[in-house]
Amino acid sequence: MSITTPANPTDAVRLVTTEDAPWADTGTGVLLKVVRFDSSHGTWVILNRFQPGVQLQTHRHTGSVDAFTSAGRWHDLEYDFYVTEGSYLYEPANSVHTLHVPAENTGDTDVCFIIEGALLNLAEDGSVESVSDGPGTLEAYYALLEAQGDPRPNGLIV
């Protein structure tokens, strides 16, 4: 058996040690780490740490989302179930929801999101108020780290 090294280094297996990457503080009770951004497929992988009581703007996904919760609990206001530590949630394209972390949580809630496409952040009337996507999130992550005085992490897969 032989092992071939890919001609394109971006095709190689990559390991990211997320503990080595700094959290970017958004100032809204949400901490962020960008782990991967693939511009050719529109896929982005982020880690979020939500403080108790955080609520995100209602949004629509243009693609599917996979969510893995490693600590805490959260829910979408539109549904009657909670996503808890050890849970996996699939959100199909075009789903609309409002992520909420209960204020009575006793600690932070950590979630890894694998996102295809963009989030369309909606105004109360349902119109698109803003767009969150991989390129914009990566740019914001770098800007927040710079403002905090933290270096860009090594090993980020872009």
Task: Outline where the language-model segments fall.
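Conserved short histidine dyad/triad with adjacent acidic residue
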Residues: 29, 34-36, 42-60, 92-96
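Short, well-ordered beta-strand segments in beta-rich or mixed alpha/beta enzyme
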Residues: 47-50, 69-74, 99, 111-113
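Short acidic-glycine-tyrosine-enriched beta hairpin
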Residues: 39, 77-97
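A short, N-terminal "cap"/entry segment at the start of jelly-roll beta-barrel domains
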Residues: 1-42, 135-136, 145-158
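Glycine- and acidic-residue-biased ligand/ion/polar-headgroup-sensing regions
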Residues: 52, 61-78, 84
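Ligand-binding loop in jelly-roll beta-barrel domains
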Residues: 93-124
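Short glycine/proline-enriched turns and hinge-like loops at secondary-structure junctions
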Residues: 42-43, 60-62, 81-82, 103-104
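Glycine- and charge-enriched low-complexity intrinsically disordered segments
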Residues: 126-145
